[in-house]
Amino acid sequence: MVTSFLPSLFVPLVGLVFPAVAMASLFLYIEKDEIA
């Protein structure tokens, strides 16, 4: 019954972790572009 626990881990991963990584990478890209 591993699949029953999969959505409870997949939803927060996509809903919280992915946007945080996307915002961090975008922020670093903008900062690097302004400094260069």
Curated annotation (Swiss-Prot):
Q: Name one Pfam family in it.
A: PSI_8
Looking at the UniProt entry, the stretches that span the membrane are 10-30
A single cellular component GO annotation: photosystem I
Q: Which biological process terms from the Gene Ontology are attached to this UniProt entry?
A: photosynthesis
Location within or outside the cell:
Plastid, Chloroplast thylakoid membrane
Q: Which domain of life is it from?
A: Eukaryota
Membrane keyword on record? yes
Q: Which UniProt keywords apply?
A: Chloroplast, Membrane, Photosynthesis, Photosystem I, Plastid, Thylakoid, Transmembrane, Transmembrane helix
This protein's membrane topology, according to the annotation, is: Single-pass membrane protein
- Main location (coarse class): plastid
Please give the family membership noted in the entry: Belongs to the PsaI family.
What this chain does, per the record? May help in the organization of the PsaL subunit.
User: What's the protein name?
Assistant: Photosystem I reaction center subunit VIII
Q: Which organism is it from?
A: Nephroselmis olivacea
Lineage, broadest ranks: Eukaryota, Viridiplantae, Chlorophyta, Nephroselmidophyceae, Nephroselmidales
